[in-house]
Amino acid sequence: MQTLAQHLTSQAVNDSLSQLILTLADTSKAISHAVRHGALAGVLGATEQENVQGETQKKLDIITNDMLKDALKADGTVRGLASEEEDHVVEVSTNGQYLVCFDPLDGSSNIDINSLVGTIFSILPASAGELTETSFLQSGRNQLAAGYVLYGPSTMLALTTGQGVQLFTLHPETNEFLLTNAAMSISADTQEFAINMSNQRFWEAPMQTYIADLLLGKIGPREKSFNMRWIAAMVGDVHRVLSRGGIFTYPTDNKDPKKPYKLRLMYEANPMAFLVEQAGGKASTGYETILDIQPTQIHQRVAVILGSSNEVDACLSYHGLDYSEEPSLD
């Protein structure tokens, strides 16, 4: 089996980008260690702090954020970083070539119940000149690499550099990420969907109708039965989609009119959309392809519908759109 470093060499990924990806992977090993120790290390539970989104921070949110910040500052290739746990972008090195956006611990509400959590990251090119928030506001099509690390029964890294999606598994003895799936592929059709049903009454009418038709199964207009899955961590739900197909959605809702969307574009939706498209799936807000969105702020939120291409098309048809053409990977 190839190690991650060997794989990057075989894919002709340039040295500086390879170095950055390896830094993120090495840091995820340390995060995996902290997650596994849990209560034994006193890292569970919440703090009295809130992040910029007004969410109460877990102890591990802060710990993992600091671990990634420290590693990226020491890497030498990073111009700046943006994190879910940071109010503003952070300047790292004036000589850096890359910008890194990340969610250090996606699904952190799961940590106290020993359920799935993960790290999501996106790598963008840095431009010359002063580093500002605007430097980061690039469409998802500009991503040079993206991935996530899933901390579950085994620790897994899903990665794309624009050459498909590869899956690596952390070997518990050698502490190396080894290539275990060289070409992850999302089936075009599915009978699984993932959505937070507790918000049903707050969704837009197209989404309510779409889900209602799925629930009708064989006796409804879809004429087949569907199963619902929900992990309450985007990283876990998207991993399932990449592994065996499905559709994952966190749609627009009016539960809080000031916050109609849940997921963040720059460090959740964009990297996951890049992975999904590279694996043959599709990703949309319901009205726009996610990777084509021009961001307006670093913590911008969007609706997300992603997964098996035919099922995403079916969902979008309820929104009055036809996305039957294959997405551009340029």
Curated annotation (Swiss-Prot):
Q: Name one GO biological process term.
A: sucrose biosynthetic process
Query: Which annotated residues bind Mg(2+) 1?
Result: E84, D103, L105
Q: Which reaction does it catalyse?
A: beta-D-fructose 1,6-bisphosphate + H2O = beta-D-fructose 6-phosphate + phosphate
Residue ranges annotated as coiled coil are none
Please state what class of enzyme this protein is.
hydrolase
Please give the SUPFAM superfamilies that the UniProt record associates with this protein: Carbohydrate phosphatase (SSF56655)
Q: Where does Mg(2+) 2 bind?
A: D103, D106, E268
Entry annotated with the keyword S-adenosyl-L-methionine: no
Return the InterPro entries for the record. Answer: FBPase_C_dom, FBPase_class-1, FBPase_N, FBPtase
Q: Give the pathway listed in the UniProt entry for this protein.
A: Carbohydrate biosynthesis; gluconeogenesis
Which residues does the record give as substrate binding sites? D106, G107, S108, S109, N196, K262
Which regions span the lipid bilayer? none
What detail does the entry give on cofactor binding? Binds 2 magnesium ions per subunit.
CC annotations in GO: cytosol
The SS bond pairs are: none
Which molecular function terms from Gene Ontology are attached? Answer: fructose 1,6-bisphosphate 1-phosphatase activity; magnesium ion binding
User: What keywords is this UniProt entry annotated with?
Assistant: Carbohydrate metabolism, Cytoplasm, Hydrolase, Magnesium, Metal-binding
Q: List localization entries.
A: Cytoplasm
Q: What is its EC number?
A: 3.1.3.11
Cofactor dependence: Mg(2+)
Looking up HAMAP family in the UniProt record yields: FBPase_class1 (MF_01855)
Subunit field text: Homotetramer.
Q: Which family does it belong to?
A: Belongs to the FBPase class 1 family.
Report the NCBIfam families cross-referenced here: PRK09293.1-3 (NF006779), PRK09293.1-4 (NF006780)
Name of the protein described by the UniProt record: Fructose-1,6-bisphosphatase class 1
